[in-house]
Swiss-Prot record:
ATP binds at R299, D300, E301, E562, G614, L615, D616, R617. It is an enzyme of class 6 (ligase). Its EC number is 6.1.1.12. L-aspartate binds at E253, R299, R569. It is found in: Plastid, Chloroplast; Mitochondrion. This is Aspartate--tRNA ligase, chloroplastic/mitochondrial. GO terms for biological process: tRNA aminoacylation for protein translation. It catalyses: tRNA(Asp) + L-aspartate + ATP = L-aspartyl-tRNA(Asp) + AMP + diphosphate. It comes from Arabidopsis thaliana. Residues 91-176 bind DNA. GO terms for molecular function: aspartate-tRNA ligase activity; ATP binding; DNA binding; metal ion binding. Residues 277-280 are annotated as: Aspartate. The lineage of its organism: Eukaryota, Viridiplantae, Streptophyta, Embryophyta, Tracheophyta. Pfam families: GAD (PF02938), tRNA-synt_2 (PF00152), tRNA_anti-codon (PF01336).
């Protein structure tokens, strides 16, 4: 019988006749003693004895107990932990029917619990009632199986299963809860067909989705990562875990806040925390030397594959710890996690790149260094060029950088470079075009005629040499403001690396990016804003020119993804007030929104710093998942909705009235 048919619910059944039917003529029936008024909680099951039904008994179809009867059963073993050491042992197992098949007059099912799967078989001659009930089961029924562990026949051994050398012969079976509706997808084959099952269906029926082996592995992996982190920080370094408030206050900078109206203080609002930043700084002022928290954070922002409106981060803060000690402690922690969880050995120490070097060489502050494709600045080649597009860009303060793609001349045709996927990738970054040149086998270059003709023979040789190009290579240009050029070439670099399979997936690229600028220019608002956050300390040597200062900030980047970021903090009030002033926060606004922080800095705040890791993102990368939604038990969709509970939702008008809220 097909797996699909096995998922269909049984039809409603009824009592048949008071006349006894022998087991030999009705192996699909079982017997319970006849009662006019069954006692509450009566166990509606059957005996494993092959004795025929006695006269006066009531014969019923093999259906579970009535809905009003709830049974709590115990088990002696777990399905995935049985082995040859258990042969001969009588066991009680509970779980879900993962597979059901009939072969040679015998019925087999795979019984699944959180530890794994074990095969259960029937012996119709010895235990006909158990055979009859199992024969009519459907996938995902919740059942109790009592039986004896036996070794599988040699021809039936399955070395791919952890329990593949044993099976359980069912002597007594009870259906604890049947499936009464058609399943939206098959759990058993869902891992193989994951790409065919729409994610909205998986999220809508998350309880089924989480039964899949891959999803279970992801959630267990997450648990193991958190358990290891807790053990390491507490036992090795003396950290203590402290919870910080969820109901906090809205602060400027960063993403939009989720607001919570106050009923008691009408017209006022709490904000859900985007991070525990200021609270953990308060803890350092309070004298708690080493703090950490597995913190829930909330940001009302546009979503991508690695973003959620509510997410979890590993949050840490330490007092009296210079930057070198801070980086070493975190390197040791991450090496421990990768080594114990995945067996990956990371370098000691981690490589470092300054922000300026990362942007110059890769066009990104989170570079993936598993492949080369470094960018080259060739502005000097075109300072006196006759190609006006380039010279005008330089005259307006822009730059010209190139990305040299080895053997890319044949990979990408001229038409692809003018209107294909690689061209579209450049357009997505905001570029107005994609200038390119190709190095021919004879060393000549071809491409945009006006660009080629702007270079004399010596200029061509110098240009090709400066690009590091060879015959057959493709040279892609980024022209314009520094930020725009880096954004375009970073995007093209990643596109080409994936498209040409240049990434060595056996390598693990982890590094620190340091020396970030303190501030960046916000063009729409025409003001400076903090690149990280306004509580980051500047480098001491840059204190005389704070608007241009570099920050004592550091980001940890793994395979091109930022997995953690932190900084040393400002711990003196006058410096903090100056930074807030630079980003446009007046003294009055600073006192209103950050008065408690400024007061604390005047009460003996120690030098301190910290870091936060995106736990969801870290587990996603350790587990090889494509989205953080696959490592969160109950995630939100890309439209910030919970498909399972259908939230957000409308609320009772009375609740809004109590909160003095009126909606449009």
């Amino acid at each position: 019988m097909s797996l699909l048919l096995r998922t269909l619910p049984l039809r409603p059944t009824r009592f048949l006749s008071a006349t006894a039917i022998s087991i030999s003529n009705a192996t699909n029936f079982f017997v319970v003693p006849k009662r006019t008024n069954p006692l509450p909680g009566t166990r509606r099951t059957f005996s494993s004895s092959p004795v025929a039904a006695a006269s006066g008994d009531v014969v019923v179809k093999p259906v579970p107990s009535p809905p009003s009867v709830l049974r709590w059963v115990s088990r002696t073993e777990l399905c995935g932990e049985l082995s040859v050491n258990d042969v001969g042992k009588r066991v009680h197992l509970c779980g879900w029917v993962a597979l059901h098949r009939v072969h040679g007059g015998l019925t087999f099912l795979n019984l699944r619990d959180h530890t794994g799967i074990v095969q259960v078989r029937t012996l119709p001659d010895e235990f006909p009632e158990a055979h009859g009930l199992i024969n009519d089961m459907r996938l995902e029924y919740v059942v109790l199986v009592e039986g004896t562990v036996r070794s599988r026949p040699n021809e039936s051994v399955n070395k791919k299963m952890k329990t593949g050398f044993v099976e359980v012969v069912a002597e007594h079976v009870e259906i604890l809860n049947p499936v009464r509706t058609k399943l939206p997808f098959l759990v058993t084959t869902a891992d193989e067909n994951k790409d065919l099952i729409k994610e909205e269906i998986r999220l809508r029926f998350r309880c089924l989705d989480l039964r899949r082996q891959q999803m279970k592995n992801n959630i267990v992996l997450r648990h193991n990562v958190v358990k290891l982190i807790r053990r390491y920080l507490e036992d090795r370094h003396g950290f203590i875990e402290i919870e910080t408030p969820i109901l906090s206050r809205s602060t400027p900078e960063g993403a939009r806040d989720y607001l919570v109206p106050s009923r008691i203080q009408s017209g006022t609002f709490y904000a859900l925390p985007q991070s525990p930043q200021l609270f953990k700084q308060m803890l350092m002022v309070s004298g708690f030397d080493k703090y950490y928290q597995i913190a829930r954070c909330f940001r009302d922002e546009d979503l991508r594959a690695d973003r959620q409106p509510e997410f979890t981060q590993l949050d840490m803060e330490m007092a009296f710890m210079p930057m070198e000690d801070m980086l070493k402690l975190n390197e040791d922690l991450i090496r421990k996690v990768f080594s114990e969880i995945k067996g990956i050995q990371l370098p000691d120490p981690f490589p470092r790149l300054t922000y300026a070097d990362a942007m110059d060489r890769y066009g990104s502050d989170r570079p993936d260094t598993r492949f080369d494709l470094e960018l080259k600045d060739v502005s000097n080649v075109f300072t006196e060029s006759s190609f006006r597009v380039f010279t005008e860009a330089l005259e307006s303060g822009g730059i010209i950088k190139v990305l040299c793609v080895p053997l890319g001349a044949k990979k990408y045709s001229n038409s692809a470079l003018k209107k294909g996927d690689i061209y579209n990738e450049a357009m997505k970054s905001g570029a107005k075009g994609l200038p390119f040149l190709k190095v021919l086998d004879n060393g000549e270059i071809e491409g945009i005629a006006a660009l080629v003709s702007s270079l004399d023979s010596a200029g061509k040789i110098n240009f090709v040499k400066q690009c590091g190009a060879a015959p057959g290579d493709l040279i892609l240009f980024g022209v314009g403001p520094v930020t725009s050029v880096n954004k375009t070439l970073d995007r093209l670099r990643l596109f080409v690396a994936h498209d040409m399979d240049l990434i060595d997936h056996s390598k693990h690229s982890i590094l620190w990016v340091t020396d970030f600028p303190m501030f960046e220019w916000n063009e729409p608002e025409q003001r400076l804003e903090a690149l990280h956050h306004p509580f980051t300390a500047p480098k001491p040597e840059d204190m005389d020119d704070l608007p241009s200062a570099r920050a004592l900030a550091y980001d940890m980047v793994y395979n091109g993804v930022e997995i953690g970021g932190g900084s040393l903090r400002i711990y003196k009030r006058d410096v903090q007030e100056k930074v807030l002033e630079i980003i446009g926060i007046s003294p009055e606004e600073a006192e209103s929104k950050f008065g408690y922080l400024l007061e604390a800095l005047d009460m003996g705040a120690p030098p301190h710093g910290g870091i936060a890791y995106g736990l969801d993102r870290m587990v996603m990368m350790l587990g090889g998942a494509s989205s953080i939604r696959d490592v969160i038990a109950f995630p939100k969709t890309t439209t910030a909705q919970c498909a399972l509970t259908r939230t957000p939702s409308e609320v009772d008008p009375k609740q809004l009235q109590d909160l003095s809220i009126r909606t449009k």
